[in-house]
Amino acid sequence: MSRNPFMQNMPEIQAAGGLVPMVIEQSARGERAYDIYSRLLKERVIFLVGQVEDYMANLICAQLLFLEAENPDKDIHLYINSPGGSVTAGMAIYDTMQFIKADVSTTCIGQACSMGAFLLAGGAKGKRFCLPNSRVMIHQPLGGFQGQASDIEIHAKEILFIRERLNELLAHHTGQSLETIERDTNRDNFMSAPRAVEYGIVDAVHEKRQMPV
């Protein structure tokens, strides 16, 4: 039985009983069983599902680097269904997406909120998509540090720096002005799939697949 060493330990799957579908393939050498994520990884498909956190980020970065090593000239497909999460974990994924040679095509299924929306926008230009009923949400990073006054001041400066950097990158990927991004991320800003296209977060809404993954 083949198991994906990079498979994400997703809380949603565990909550459903830890059941991961298996795929049986026939070959001249006999049967071979894959978990569904390992089988999709063979097709250069990666899933980002749930909260963005360090463990997930490490696994996704590893998968991106692995697929680039296999074929640096073939697209990688990242499917996103996430409410957001850690900025530093998300930036690790984002930087790896930009670092590797292979184009990373992003697709929102369900929702791409906060850091999920940022990663959606960070896909290769012309290869960023939403499914018709998916939702996208952008906003400014959240803070909540507690401690001594001097430490709170330090962390306040850090979160302001992070907000500025995220806004600059989002402006770059969407084509919106920095002033527009700053205004539109001041509060939770939800978008439909067509609105996400208008805004520049994605390039198109896909209703039917027109080509293999």
Curated annotation (Swiss-Prot):
Alphabetized InterPro entries for the sequence: ClpP, ClpP/crotonase-like_dom_sf, ClpP/TepA, ClpP_His_AS, ClpP_Ser_AS
One BP term from GO: protein quality control for misfolded or incompletely synthesized proteins
Matches recorded under SUPFAM superfamilies: ClpP/crotonase
Localization: Cytoplasm
Reaction it catalyzes: Hydrolysis of proteins to small peptides in the presence of ATP and magnesium. alpha-casein is the usual test substrate. In the absence of ATP, only oligopeptides shorter than five residues are hydrolyzed (such as succinyl-Leu-Tyr-|-NHMec, and Leu-Tyr-Leu-|-Tyr-Trp, in which cleavage of the -Tyr-|-Leu- and -Tyr-|-Trp bonds also occurs)
One Pfam family per UniProt: CLP_protease
Molecular function per GO: ATP-dependent peptidase activity; ATPase binding; serine-type endopeptidase activity
Keyword vocabulary terms for this entry: Cytoplasm, Hydrolase, Protease, Serine protease
Enzyme kind, highest EC tier: hydrolase
Main location group: cytoplasm
Residues the record marks as active site: S114, H139
GO cellular component terms given for this protein: cytoplasm; endopeptidase Clp complex
EC number of this enzyme: 3.4.21.92
Function: Cleaves peptides in various proteins in a process that requires ATP hydrolysis. Has a chymotrypsin-like activity. Plays a major role in the degradation of misfolded proteins.
Family assignment from sequence similarity: Belongs to the peptidase S14 family.
Subunit: Fourteen ClpP subunits assemble into 2 heptameric rings which stack back to back to give a disk-like structure with a central cavity, resembling the structure of eukaryotic proteasomes.
NCBIfam families to which the protein is assigned, alphabetical: clpP, PRK00277.1, PRK12553.1
Name of the protein this chain belongs to: ATP-dependent Clp protease proteolytic subunit
